[in-house]
């Protein structure tokens, strides 16, 4: 009889992080996947990170997750997006060697302490009914093997009753030539989970040797490339270029003439696709005034002959894809290695989850990744690590849930959005979703999260020591700059003019001036050069934003106060005077854990919040008396 503390179903980005996190904390963990060879597979684009997404990768890394370390072993074109803007919206991104990424992830997972991997298909799970809610008991594989578990994490990606479409052709699959998961979808439905359908897509893969790159815009990465992981010193792989081309009026004419053949225009038109990553058919239809759309030709590896054309996701028939591609500059003689396609799949309403990502209907069942309505490797990884941590912690009946708030991390923003607001289309993170993005930056994810993770045993002692060394260095340099006084005359000697009022200013305060940076200050104070480049950058960013932090602090304190005003799980909202029936039903369904969460539920009025607060205070005072 096989027994585990935690079982994770799915070996994608979410499943890998969930399994590793649970195992790291000490849970006896089993990862079940259709195929060990596809663990860590990059199903769509061969890249990690981007705007907001790159910050999530660093947050996962700060919690000792895998994604940051793995991409650093596969990065072949690294860049910081939005570099010309403020550090709060910088987006680390790395083009990956697809094979190296998969192999590095598999190497991590297959050698992880406390973690076992099983190649099987799970068709069902069972529960016990000896408590107020059904409680996870076991999973049953396709060959009827029963595996007992205390906690179960579903990270099924696009496999939950997935169907692939290419034109009028369709077949059950979660990924090209990989079977979908039908049994689990039926099991979830039997427990009355609210299931919906979403879709996503991928472009055709192209033969590199059939592309004419001359005349196309070359896109080199940063020199030197920046690593994602706080534990990585550098990127050691050769860096190669991507190339930029674009569609044109001829391309759009081919697409318009064949719109009726695209699956997304017919069979799938009622199923929502990612709003911010539309297919080329949807781009042409929605933005009819535009004559071109960018297409990024991204290599799939150092030794790969395959090119990923980012920007032309399609569900048109293969012959239409071929005709369309040949109208694009550089692709006149292109050969398709694999057709683009669209995939539709089941997801559950994420409002049926707590902030821990445990379901409200079944105790011990957690969901993470695309099953919760998100899109993207990074969003999946962020959910996976939270689900894994909480599943492992909850093995102790007196555990404190590990919940990241909106002021803690982009992961916290995402999960709060999902479980509070739900989603009717694939959810993607953006910096605009975060109220406190000045604090939620890519440079300080370790300062924000590593200690929190260490306290619950999700972070290794080695990483914790690395964090403390960094904090010491940052504090030392910050104190030096705050104690160092500079006169306007000293700055003028280095070509920097500020108000000649004779007023003494600290070097730290001067950094808030947009015309002054660490390069200038290091010419005046040589000791700055003794610090690591990352420390210098960290202190400079903190100094630049310091005046804004002061203004934002009141907002954050108000937010924290509301988040810390807990609402008992067993509260009966029907007993609160002044709440409409509609609001009572919403609150009873959502079961918000705090006043802050209740306030963010659509339709819950300020007056309702006041009534809830009055009720909580009244009963608190009653208990005291």
Swiss-Prot record:
UniProt-annotated stretches for the region Disordered: 204-226
SUPFAM superfamilies for the chain: FAD/NAD(P)-binding domain
Taxonomy, superkingdom: Bacteria
Keywords: Cytoplasm, FAD, Flavoprotein, NAD, tRNA processing
Residues given in the record as FAD binding sites: 10-15, 122, 181, 370
GO MF: flavin adenine dinucleotide binding
Name of the protein in question: tRNA uridine 5-carboxymethylaminomethyl modification enzyme MnmG
């Amino acid at each position: 009889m096989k027994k585990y503390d935690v079982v994770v179903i799915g070996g994608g980005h979410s499943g890998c992080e969930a399994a590793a996190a649970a195992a790291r904390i000490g849970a006896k963990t089993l990862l079940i996947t259709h195929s060990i060879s596809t663990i860590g597979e990059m199903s769509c684009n061969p890249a990690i990170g981007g705007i907001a997404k790159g910050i999530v990768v660093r947050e996962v890394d700060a919690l000792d997750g895998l994604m940051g370390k793995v991409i650093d072993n596969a990065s072949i074109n690294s860049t910081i997006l939005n570099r010309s803007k403020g550090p709060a919206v910088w987006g680390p991104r790395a083009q990956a060697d697809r094979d190296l990424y998969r192999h590095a992830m598999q190497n991590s997972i297959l050698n992880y302490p406390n973690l076992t991997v099983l190649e099987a298909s799970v068709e069902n799970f069972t529960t016990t009914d000896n408590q107020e809610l059904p409680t996870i008991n076991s999973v049953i594989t396709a060959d009827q093997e029963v595996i007992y578990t205390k906690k179960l994490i579903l990270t099924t990606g696009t496999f939950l009753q997935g169907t692939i479409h290419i034109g009028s052709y369709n077949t059950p699959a979660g990924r090209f030539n990989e079977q979908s998961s039908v049994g689990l979808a039926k099991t979830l439905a039997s427990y009355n989970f609210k299931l919906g359908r979403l879709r996503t897509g991928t472009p055709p893969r192209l033969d590199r040797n059939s592309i004419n790159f001359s005349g196309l815009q070359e896109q080199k990465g940063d020199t030197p490339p920046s690593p994602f992981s706080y534990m990585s010193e550098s990127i050691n792989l050769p860096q190669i270029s991507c190339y930029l081309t674009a569609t044109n009026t001829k391309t759009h004419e081919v697409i318009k003439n064949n719109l009726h053949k695209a699956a997304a225009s017919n069979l799938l038109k009622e199923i929502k696709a990612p709003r911010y990553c539309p297919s080329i058919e949807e781009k042409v239809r929605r933005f009819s005034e535009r004559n071109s759309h960018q297409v990024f030709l991204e290599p799939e590896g150092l030794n790969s002959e395959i090119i990923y054309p980012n920007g032309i996701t399609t569900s048109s028939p293969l012959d239409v894809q071929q005709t369309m591609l040949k109208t694009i500059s550089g692709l006149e003689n292109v050969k398709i290695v694999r057709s683009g396609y669209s995939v539709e799949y089941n997801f559950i309403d994420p409002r049926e989850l707590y902030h821990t990502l445990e379901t409200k209907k079944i105790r011990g069942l957690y969901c993470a990744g695309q099953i919760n309505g998100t899109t993207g490797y990074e969003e999946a990884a962020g959910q996976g690590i939270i689900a894994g941590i909480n599943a492992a912690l909850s093995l102790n009946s007196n555990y404190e849930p590990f919940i990241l708030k909106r002021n803690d991390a982009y992961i916290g923003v995402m999960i709060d959005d999902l479980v509070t607001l739900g989603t009717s289309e694939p959810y993607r993170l953006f910096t605009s979703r975060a109220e406190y993005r000045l604090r939620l930056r890519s440079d300080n994810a370790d300062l924000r999260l590593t200690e929190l993770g260490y306290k619950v045993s999700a972070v290794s002692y080695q990483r914790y020591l690395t964090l403390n060394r960094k904090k010491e260095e940052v504090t030392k340099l910050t104190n030096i700059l705050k104690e160092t006084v500079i006169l306007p005359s000293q700055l003028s000697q280095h070509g920097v003019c500020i108000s000649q009022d004779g007023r003494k200013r600290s070097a730290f305060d001067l950094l808030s001036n947009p015309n002054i940076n660490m390069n200038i200050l290091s010419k005046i104070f040589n000791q700055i050069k003794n610090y690591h480049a990352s420390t210098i950058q960290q202190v400079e960013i903190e100094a630049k934003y310091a005046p804004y932090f002061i203004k934002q602090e009141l907002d954050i304190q108000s937010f924290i106060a509301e988040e810390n005003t807990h609402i008992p799980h067993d509260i009966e909202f029907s007993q609160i005077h002044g709440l409409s029936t509609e609001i009572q039903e919403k609150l009873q369904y959502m079961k918000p854990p705090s006043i802050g969460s209740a306030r963010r539920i659509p339709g819950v009025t300020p007056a309702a919040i006041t009534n809830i607060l009055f009720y909580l205070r009244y009963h608190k005072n009653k208990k005291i008396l």
